[in-house]
């Protein structure tokens, strides 16, 4: 985990990370996409396969004509170790539309729970990494393969420059 001080990230700028290890050079780059404002979250009461709670729907308006990709996390604010895992999406099927897609996770918030929702804007190569990682670990793929990385020299993993926003709400 690398951190810098007095560093201001700029939307639209491409950042490059270079690592030299044991005589080999690994390079990755990522561009910070424009922020798509998170307008809030809706809760839809649900009883699904015997589990009752609420499904979370993040509200945001995807800009038309611009390729956007996202990663979402949500947590029970009273127990931050109880989280949904991550959910990733892009605008291939909802370009320019208000998000209506509910997100299902490992946890279903109940009435009275305090929820923290995080939304990250990521560039396309990072989305491709998440997508290929999910395809290879879901149990529904063919032969196992490494996820598509945005690193050179066949390195695994990803480097990301991203925007971030957070929203908290009490489940009604």
Residue ranges and their predicted role:
Residues 1-172:
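A sequence/structural signal for flexible, mid-protein segments enriched
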